[in-house]
């Protein structure tokens, strides 16, 4: 049967990545000056913004002949990139090996395994150059595995390049009226790619990154020096870093806002119960950053603010959506 694309029928899973919806927020931002819109990346087929990166990098490797049937994809991930790569590997017939932080939710680990990925759980609270860190474990596996590629999203220029299109979508969806974009930063690929596109269209667009307490990213942006004193354990997954990723272009980011583990978790739960949006931990962090910025008087009546919600809440059932976990962290009574 010939597929008639005019009927909105797709022939590949990968066609369901990108062109995610933009939704205006009402209840969670009530009382704040300006208008607020969520870029819902959970509408990608793999339910996160990382689908875009995985597709872009895999297709690039295929074009260059680096990936062939039977090849292996190796990556370091807090969960979402790993899931997206495992999904595409299942589709394409590649072996997929993911080194994942033990801070990642058990849900993410099980989802990776469900797609056939081999998972290596690594301690989160070790230095990046420690042989047990997920960076070093992934590198070692890649070096020991013939016919493999190491995606290396923290230092791969294709990561931000993949999100140039995300910036284009945001610009077109707001008809060029956007004044601020708020994005959580881990590898920095999402925020950097979006920022490049938006600033090319209008240099006055303010790009606001969201960082975690326990991460060195905000301080580095301000001083251009890595301060190890900034680094200590924290709970939020997929945000902040204990190293400085070259995938982050600090020159196109105007400001970073830090949020606490507790505030981000509570805000994600509030988002579900007010807007009906069941989003991930970093989505709570992003909307918490918006509130802090608004309370500091930095938005006005003319502000058109886009907040990127990176993934779906189903990946955090055993964490922020578990009352037991929240109580153990001291986040709720």
Curated annotation (Swiss-Prot):
Tree of life domain: Bacteria
Chemical reaction(s) catalysed: O-phospho-L-serine + sulfite + H(+) = L-cysteate + phosphate
Pathway: Lipid metabolism
Activity-pH behavior: Optimum pH is 9.5.
Entry coiled-coil feature ranges: none
SUPFAM superfamilies reported for this sequence: Tryptophan synthase beta subunit-like PLP-dependent enzymes
Pfam families: PALP
Cofactor(s) the protein needs: pyridoxal 5'-phosphate
E.C. number: 2.5.1.76
Gene Ontology biological process terms in this record: alpha-amino acid metabolic process
Positions annotated to bind pyridoxal 5'-phosphate: 80, 186-190, 282
Gene3D superfamilies named in the record: 3.40.50.1100
Official protein name in the record: Cysteate synthase
Species this chain originates from: Capnocytophaga ochracea (strain ATCC 27872 / DSM 7271 / CCUG 9716 / JCM 12966 / NCTC 12371 / SS31 / VPI 2845) (Bacteroides ochraceus)
Phylogenetic placement of the source organism: Bacteria, Pseudomonadati, Bacteroidota, Flavobacteriia, Flavobacteriales
